[in-house]
């Protein structure tokens, strides 16, 4: 190979007859340089002329030859990026010459010849990467900060990325093959910011835990607290130092007896000396019992407003929480707060949520509710006592409460808040009419008589619905029509005014409802007819309203004749259909009537002793509630023969009622036609208009 002395990068040196020529790299070079000794070592390992090099007399002589230069600065050559750095190859210029006469030439290799077996692309598989390392094709690697990815630089200066698995031998493999190893410092390698970032998360975590526990010690239990983990055991009761319920006994109507009992409790709190001077003890608890909507919670609010002492209020369901033991902890916390404010009142609404009978044995394991009620029993009348704290509680299920909770010393008094009578309903209607524009034609007495069995909540809803109807009709005041329509809406649902009813169906419904009304009007000792309507409401195509006796409702006592009349009235609709339209054209409209008749007849036989064959014996006792420690289902305490007798007696009572109804309708068929025609024309007939059909006096009460 010829060289030119004018090229400063081509140097020659003669040593014992051998000539070493260092040729310049190809024009594609970079500015970064490496020592020639490093280049010689790397290229010597991969030289294809290794055998020829071994033919030299001595490797030491060759090393001396390579490092003998008068100008060390000239032994630095540029490291190319593409193609790779030059290598040292030893070639024999003439095989016939002696060893000392051989020429050793260092030339730049052909890049394609050495890198042709490297993988393509910038993303290598791990197996391809290991294969290239073992072949010496990888010059250096740089690991990511977490060690999951590395970036390699091949001998041809190509770069690729490899996803690194968890291989503990990788570092040893790289070191054995002379690969330069480094680790990325990450972006923005500022040590101060890295240090702060590493500390930030632990500081935030500890700060959050500290804040939560501080909130648990003085959080939701106090005013404005956010609560915390420790707050689970704290009571959720609302505390009022000076109760501002806005309710007094003057706002409570229709519960005079209950007010009298509770006014005495208020007097205990205001003037305790008057009672203690006579040796009387202040009652520790007062249980308000009554149906839903009778005003139990309203009475408790009135007590708070009248007493003027600190008032705690909570719902029993708030005691039981997700975690075991929280209920008992909250009971303790509630009474600790109450004792610190004594004398005071603690009101627990719907106490049956935690006060149910114990020992049902249904769930297995420990019942959280039992822990809560045990703690409540201890706080109300336990070893330490709770002097100065009066507990008010309300429930509509007194039958499910534990007997230990109802004994004297805990709930000393049970105040029954029952449905109001006529006088009470009049007072309640007046209370709920405050702030409403009531017309002069409204008679509270008549409205009260049309609403037997209504509670205070029902009457409040009635007046509210009447006000809504008046506003919908763009009226300036509430008249009796709005109250009447609101009453029917509450009882039977809204009118279906847009329902398309054929004339045939309207005629059928008119005769059906006329049959009910006619039989009811001519039955002795039965409720008077209040209104008849064939306007569809809810699931009913027509309705007949009767005004039940106030005395009968309050006493709950029904005679045998009344129950027999009730069955006959219920069958009057089906009888009218049969008489007018024939047996083949009767409809399913009497299905609810049959259910009512069957229920009344079976109760007369099984419970009320109105059957001669069964006698004064109750058969088929009601099943107990298994969650109250009672039997899972009712036991059949009678034989199959007795069951057959019961069925026969029920059927006989129903048949007798059917005969009575049919006799009335066939006898007074003219009045039936008049009433049905009036209903077809007007769709609604009130009780007075209906009774005017009997002015001629020809119709007489049915006598069996």
UniProtKB/Swiss-Prot annotation:
UniProt entry tagged with the keyword Signal: no
Tissue and organ expression note: Ubiquitous.
Listed Pfam families: AAA (PF00004), AAA_lid_3 (PF17862), Peptidase_M41 (PF01434)
SMART domains: AAA
Span of the transit peptide along the chain: 1-58, 59-76
Segments traversing the membrane: 193-213
InterPro entries associated with the record: AAA+_ATPase, AAA_lid_3, ATPase_AAA_core, ATPase_AAA_CS, FtsH, P-loop_NTPase, Peptidase_M41, Peptidase_M41-like
Function: Part of a complex that function as an ATP-dependent zinc metallopeptidase. Involved in the thylakoid formation and in the removal of damaged D1 in the photosystem II, preventing cell death under high-intensity light conditions. Not involved in the degradation of the light-harvesting complex of photosystem II (LHC II) or in thermotolerance.
Membership in a protein family: In the N-terminal section; belongs to the AAA ATPase family.
Subunit: Heterohexamers with FTSH1, FTSH2 and FTSH8.
Designated name of the protein: ATP-dependent zinc metalloprotease FTSH 5, chloroplastic
Gene source species: Arabidopsis thaliana
Lineage: Eukaryota, Viridiplantae, Streptophyta, Embryophyta, Tracheophyta
């Amino acid at each position: 190979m010829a060289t030119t002395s004018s090229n400063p990068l081509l140097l020659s040196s003669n040593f014992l007859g051998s000539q070493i020529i260092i040729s310049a790299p190809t024009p594609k070079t970079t500015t970064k340089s490496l020592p020639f000794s490093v280049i010689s070592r790397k290229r010597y390992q991969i030289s294809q002329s290794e055998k020829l090099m071994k033919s030299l007399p001595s490797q030491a002589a060759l090393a001396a030859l390579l490092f003998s230069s008068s100008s060390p600065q000239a032994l630095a050559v540029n490291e190319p990026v593409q193609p790779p750095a030059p290598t040292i190859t030893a070639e024999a210029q003439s095989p016939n010459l002696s060893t000392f006469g051989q020429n050793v030439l260092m030339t730049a290799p052909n890049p394609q010849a050495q890198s042709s077996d490297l993988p393509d692309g910038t993303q290598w598989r791990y197996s391809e990467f290991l294969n290239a390392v073992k072949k010496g094709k990888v010059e250096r690697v740089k690991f990511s900060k977490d060690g999951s990815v590395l970036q390699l630089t091949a001998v041809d200066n190509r770069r690729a990325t490899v996803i690194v698995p968890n291989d503990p031998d990788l570092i040893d493999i790289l070191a054995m093959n002379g690969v330069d190893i480094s680790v990325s410092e990450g972006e923005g390698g500022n040590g101060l910011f890295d240090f702060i970032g590493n500390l930030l998360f632990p500081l935030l975590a500890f700060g959050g835990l500290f804040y939560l526990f501080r909130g648990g010690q003085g959080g939701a239990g106090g005013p404005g607290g956010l609560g915390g983990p420790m707050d689970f055991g704290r009571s959720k009761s609302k505390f009022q130092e000076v109760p501002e319920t806005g309710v007094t006994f003057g706002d409570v109507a229709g519960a005079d007896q209950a007010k009298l009992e509770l006014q005495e409790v208020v007097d205990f709190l205001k003037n305790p000396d008057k009672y203690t001077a006579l040796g009387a003890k202040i009652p520790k608890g007062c249980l308000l019992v009554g149906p839903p909507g009778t005003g139990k919670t309203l009475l408790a609010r009135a007590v708070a407003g009248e007493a003027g002492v600190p008032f705690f209020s909570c719902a029993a369901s708030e005691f039981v929480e997700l975690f075991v033991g929280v209920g008992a902890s909250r009971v303790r916390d509630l009474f600790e707060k109450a004792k610190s404010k004594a004398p005071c009142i603690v009101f627990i609404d719907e106490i049956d949520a935690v006060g149910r009978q114990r020992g049902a044995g249904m769930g297995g394991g420990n019942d959280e509710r039992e822990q809560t009620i045990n703690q409540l029993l201890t706080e109300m009348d336990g070893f330490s006592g709770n002097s100065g704290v009066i507990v008010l509680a309300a429930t509509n299920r007194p039958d499910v409460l534990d007997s230990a909770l109802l004994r004297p010393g805990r709930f000393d008094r049970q105040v029954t808040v029952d449905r109001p009578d006529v006088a009470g309903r009049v007072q309640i209607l007046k209370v709920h009419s405050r702030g409403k524009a009531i017309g002069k034609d409204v008679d509270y007495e008549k409205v009260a008589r049309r609403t037997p069995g209504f509670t205070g909540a029902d009457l409040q809803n009635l007046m509210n619905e009447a006000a809504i109807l008046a506003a919908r009709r763009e009226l300036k005041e509430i008249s009796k029509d709005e109250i009447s329509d609101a009453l029917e809406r509450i009882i039977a649902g809204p009118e279906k005014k847009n329902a398309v009813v054929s004339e045939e169906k309207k005629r059928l419904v008119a005769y059906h409802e006329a049959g009910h009304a006619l039989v009811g009007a001519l039955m002795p000792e039965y409720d008077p007819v209040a209104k008849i309507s064939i306007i569809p409401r809810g699931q009913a195509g027509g309705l007949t309203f009767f005004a039940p006796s106030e005395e009968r409702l309050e006493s709950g006592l029904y005679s045998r004749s009344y129950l027999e009349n009730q069955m006959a009235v219920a069958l009057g609709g089906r009888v009218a259909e049969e008489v007018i339209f024939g047996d083949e054209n009767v409809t399913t409209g009497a299905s609810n009537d049959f259910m009512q008749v069957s229920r009344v007849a079976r109760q007369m036989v099984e419970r009320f002793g109105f059957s001669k064959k069964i006698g004064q014996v109750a058969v088929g006792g009601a099943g107990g509630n298994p969650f109250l420690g009672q039997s899972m289902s009712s036991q059949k305490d009678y034989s199959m023969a007795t069951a057959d007798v019961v069925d026969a007696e029920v059927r006989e009572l129903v048949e007798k009622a059917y005969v009575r109804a049919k006799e009335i309708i066939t006898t007074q068929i003219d009045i039936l036609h008049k009433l049905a025609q009036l209903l077809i024309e007007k769709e609604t007939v009130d009780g007075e208009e209906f009774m005017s059909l009997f002015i001629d006096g020809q119709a007489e009460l049915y006598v069996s």
